[in-house]
């Protein structure tokens, strides 16, 4: 019987095509048979994504069943996996999460996952996420929910506490932190083996070793950090270096992420998210309009051309047919096909993995995926 995979929020131009590619490029899943259901609440969002899925399947020469629907129950009925990436009017509410706390003196780095803004972001996304999980309890109680939505660990914890559905959350922040370490050490990331744990968007590298020699790279990292100019690439490394010198471990993924969980971080992080509006024309929470914003993970966040080029029409066919590097497909390969995978970072209930955190708390830790889960 084919493996039914429901992509919830498939109309997203980042999540939908990349996850579709990963599924179609998975030889174990394709050989097992795939029934891929693209689900989004907005029908027009599905048009391009469904077209892309059929294009990619034909281009790759794989035979899978593809359908698109706006009906959540139809998508989940009999599913083996639900892969979810949703948000509620993201940028309008993010601008509110960012500015309203600042109005009352809460200086946030991002306002996405931590602090007052992160709390309201979580409360907005919890209701639809738990609704998805409760629908799964009725229609596919043995299925796994693979979540990409933020705030990652808060949503996964809501599902694990309030429903019986097995849930795992995924984030690529681990690789951002690994890239920082590789840059400082001058060693390619593929030659580094590192273990990190903590909560989503705030983990600590417990071990950093050279894959070939097995050498502990922390002594070299400390040496290279001390040698570096204190203000070099401050936006990217400043807060990390402060924490590293104080606690002896390198934090991950980046200051603009874990800075959300540190009250004083705003004093040491050059904000890489800025919403711009003229208050004389009304605040975004009054007008309902999304203000202009700049958002950057690296470099100068406010550097924009004087006369921006008009946006080009989105063509999903232009995306190369190669894996995204996310772990949803490997997890599905493990559970549905018994392929053993080593996963450097997943968000799951703690259950003793980190002894000084409660068992029911969702933590980000490395894991092994196999037929047992």
Positions of PLM-derived features:
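Rossmann-fold NAD(P)-binding glycine/threonine-rich loop
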Residues: 88, 92-162
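Redox-cofactor binding/interface segments in oxidoreductases and associated redox assembly factors
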Residues: 77, 83-84, 147
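Long, compositionally biased stretches enriched for glycine and/or charged residues
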Residues: 186-372
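N-terminal Rossmann-like dinucleotide-binding module
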Residues: 5-30, 36
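Internal, well-ordered domain-core segments that constitute the primary functional module
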Residues: 132-216
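Short acidic low-complexity segments
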Residues: 65-78
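NAD(P)-binding Rossmann-fold cofactor-contacting core
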Residues: 29-56
């Amino acid at each position: 019987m084919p493996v039914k995979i429901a992509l919830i929020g498939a109309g997203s131009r980042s999540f939908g095509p990349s996850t579709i590619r990963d599924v179609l490029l998975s030889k174990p899943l394709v050989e097992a048979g795939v029934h891929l259901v693209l689900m989004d609440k907005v029908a027009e969002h599905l048009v391009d994504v469904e077209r892309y899925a059929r294009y990619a399947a034909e281009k790759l020469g794989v035979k899978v069943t593809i359908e698109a629907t706006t009906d959540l129950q139809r998508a989940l009925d009999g599913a083996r996996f639900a892969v979810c990436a949703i948000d509620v009017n993201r940028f309008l509410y993010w601008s509110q999460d960012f500015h309203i706390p600042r109005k009352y003196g809460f200086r946030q780095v991002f306002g996405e996952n931590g602090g007052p803004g992160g709390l309201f972001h979580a409360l907005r996304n919890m209701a639809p996420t738990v609704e998805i999980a409760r629908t799964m309890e009725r229609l596919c109680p043995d299925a796994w929910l693979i979540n990409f939505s933020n705030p990652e660990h808060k949503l996964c914890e809501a599902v694990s506490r309030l429903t019986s559905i097995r849930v795992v959350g995924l984030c690529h922040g681990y690789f951002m932190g690994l890239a920082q370490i590789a840059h400082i050490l001058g060693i390619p990331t593929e030659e580094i083996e590192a273990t990190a744990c903590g909560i989503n968007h705030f983990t600590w590298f417990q071990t950093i070793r050279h894959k070939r020699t097995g050498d502990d790279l922390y002594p070299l990292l400390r040496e290279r950090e001390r040698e570096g100019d204190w203000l070099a690439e401050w936006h990217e490394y400043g807060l990390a270096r402060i924490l590293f010198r104080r606690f002896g471990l390198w934090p991950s993924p980046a200051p603009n992420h874990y800075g959300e969980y540190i009250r004083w971080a705003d004093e040491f992080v050059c904000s890489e998210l800025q919403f711009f509006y003229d208050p004389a024309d009304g605040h975004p929470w009054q007008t309902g309009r999304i203000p202009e914003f700049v958002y950057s993970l690296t470099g100068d966040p406010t550097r924009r051309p004087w006369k921006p080029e008009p946006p080009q029409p989105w063509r999903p066919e232009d995306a190369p047919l190669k894996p995204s590097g996310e772990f949803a497909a490997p997890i599905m390969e493990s559970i549905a096909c018994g392929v053993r995978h080593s996963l450097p970072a997943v968000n799951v209930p703690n259950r003793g993995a980190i002894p000084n955190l409660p068992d029911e708390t969702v933590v980000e830790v490395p894991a092994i995926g196999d037929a047992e889960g």
